[in-house]
């Protein structure tokens, strides 16, 4: 029996966390490799 509030919090935080990790990783990759020949 999962509480709806807890379930909602988890379902709300997981995509935000994944998006934040993806954005930070993409920015680091673009900053590090963007100077080669990736326009």
From Swiss-Prot:
Similarity-based family: Belongs to the PetG family.
Job of this protein: Component of the cytochrome b6-f complex, which mediates electron transfer between photosystem II (PSII) and photosystem I (PSI), cyclic electron flow around PSI, and state transitions. PetG is required for either the stability or assembly of the cytochrome b6-f complex.
Pfam families: PetG
CC annotations in GO: cytochrome b6f complex; plasma membrane-derived thylakoid membrane
TM helices/strands, residue ranges: 5-25
GO molecular function, one term: electron transporter, transferring electrons within cytochrome b6/f complex of photosystem II activity
Name the record gives this protein: Cytochrome b6-f complex subunit 5
Membrane topology of this protein: Single-pass membrane protein
Keyword Nucleotide-binding in record: no
InterPro entries, sorted: Cyt_6/f_cplx_su5, Cyt_6/f_cplx_su5_sf
Assembly with partners or alone: The 4 large subunits of the cytochrome b6-f complex are cytochrome b6, subunit IV (17 kDa polypeptide, PetD), cytochrome f and the Rieske protein, while the 4 small subunits are PetG, PetL, PetM and PetN. The complex functions as a dimer.
One Gene Ontology biological process: photosynthesis
Keyword Zinc in record: no
Main location: membrane
Keyword tags: Electron transport, Membrane, Photosynthesis, Thylakoid, Transmembrane, Transmembrane helix, Transport
Organism: Prochlorococcus marinus (strain MIT 9301)
Source species, domain of life: Bacteria
């Amino acid at each position: 029996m999962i509480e709806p509030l807890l379930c909602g919090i988890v379902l709300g935080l997981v995509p935000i966390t994944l998006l934040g990790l993806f954005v930070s990783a993409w920015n680091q990759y673009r900053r590090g490799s963007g100077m080669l020949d990736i326009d």
